[in-house]
Curated annotation (Swiss-Prot):
Gene3D superfamilies: MetI-like (1.10.3720.10)
Annotated Pfam families: BPD_transp_1
GO biological process annotation, one example: transmembrane transport
Membrane topology reported for the UniProt record: Multi-pass membrane protein
Keywords on record: Cell inner membrane, Cell membrane, Membrane, Transmembrane, Transmembrane helix, Transport
Subcellular location: Cell inner membrane
Protein name: sn-glycerol-3-phosphate transport system permease protein UgpE
Xref: InterPro entries: MetI-like, MetI-like_sf
Subunit: The complex is composed of two ATP-binding proteins (UgpC), two transmembrane proteins (UgpA and UgpE) and a solute-binding protein (UgpB).
Function of the molecule: Part of the ABC transporter complex UgpBAEC involved in sn-glycerol-3-phosphate (G3P) import. Probably responsible for the translocation of the substrate across the membrane.
GO cellular component: plasma membrane
Domain spans labelled ABC transmembrane type-1: 77-268
Amino acid sequence: MIENRRGLDIFCHIMLIIGVLLILFPLYVAFVAASLDDSQVFQAPMTLIPGPHLWQNISHIWHAGVGNNSTPFGLMLLNSFVMAFAITVGKITVSILSAYAIVYFRFPLRNLFFWLIFLTLMLPVEVRIFPTIEVIANLNLLDSYTGLTLPLMASATATFLFRQFFMTLPDELLEAARIDGAGAMRFFWDIVLPLSKTNLAALFVITFIYGWNQYLWPILITSDASMGTAVAGIRSMISTSGAPTQWNQVMAAMILTLIPPVVVVLLMQRWFVRGLVDSEK
């Protein structure tokens, strides 16, 4: 007998619609503010009808920055993209090779090495960040893409997830590869890597957003304005000297900052969902 859940379904849909509206309303307000001029954005209460100045504000910050910040926001977006993409590729490469070595290579203390990697998750960021900055400074990597990305490429979480996935692969695959004369890297490239594509897609999305949203690390590691990132740069656009903040331009910068991660999620959403589902099996 099929249970009649019409009332429950209606309630759930109403709650979902309310939740979506609560999430989208601040984004809509930011969009409206980005479309106003300098005088309209300070009117109280601010209008909720979009104005005609969106592209003008975007063009201004893209080439000239916001307010006294003369760094073009287009350059900040480029720095953020380079940082996020390098961190993503580095994390996935290091993690998948580490997990592959731990699962398929028989060497002494391999489980100990895995647990030493896993234990780094228990160290708070505040404990690790200042020693890392000192190392980067001693290597003369401040104000560089290498300094922005290299310390964030190691990931115990991704290594753990890849290890757990590799352990679910049947041993018959390895035995068949050995019979066919495939070496370790051939087995990895032709068999393990194609089977891991959904997990790779899920980790790519998660890691890209992680790298894109970095705020504290770029602030600590860079002093050159030309190496600033978008997320960290937005904070510098807000006036702290008593001068009015040009909120229309700040909101335009925030809208631009949202676009790259949204595009990544939309392009890879099918593989992303499949990767999350496969990782739970």
